[in-house]
């Protein structure tokens, strides 16, 4: 299930970013060769508490995610507005591109009651099948481990909404590793208060409107 979800997202993402048939082949190859790394990176991202009211950890998430994209050649910055969690903003300019794509994601998650979780909500656990279907915990995969598409990774925000972040990162990795590159300019706009009602989103947009034009 993990591989299937990530792969489907990567196909959609690479098709939008690159718009070339060979981008799908590049994505397939990247997932096949790097599935173990994708899962481990995803688990690490999920281990960072991201409740919107937890200002310290939210900023830790923002800096970490921003740095991941910076390492991949994006110009990154944290957009600040008074009393608000930062927006993770990034740009990747493609020479000759005639269009710009903006990806919106939120990196905060819903508040949690740890007593209602089998494992800690920010302690990602990999299962060999659906937990309710009799699945059992297994170690994170090594480099030579074959990735089973039925594996499940349980954690807060595993679906909503950190999965798109790891998907975009690996779409970028797949395209860059294959030398295909992008056909569009890319902008990133990742919010840190969506689960809290996006109370400061309009203020962010108004203050930083020039970046989004």
Residue ranges of each PLM-predicted region?
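Bacterial Sec-dependent N-terminal signal peptides
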Residues: 1-22
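Intrinsically disordered, low-complexity segments enriched in polar/charged small residues
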Residues: 8-9, 111, 161
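Intrinsically disordered and other compositionally biased segments
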Residues: 12-15, 54, 161
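Generic domain-boundary/flexible-linker signal
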Residues: 16, 112-114, 199
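Acidic/His- and Gly-rich active-site-bordering loop/insert found
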Residues: 22-156, 165, 175-183
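Acidic/histidine-rich catalytic neighborhood of metal-dependent amide-processing enzymes
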Residues: 146-213
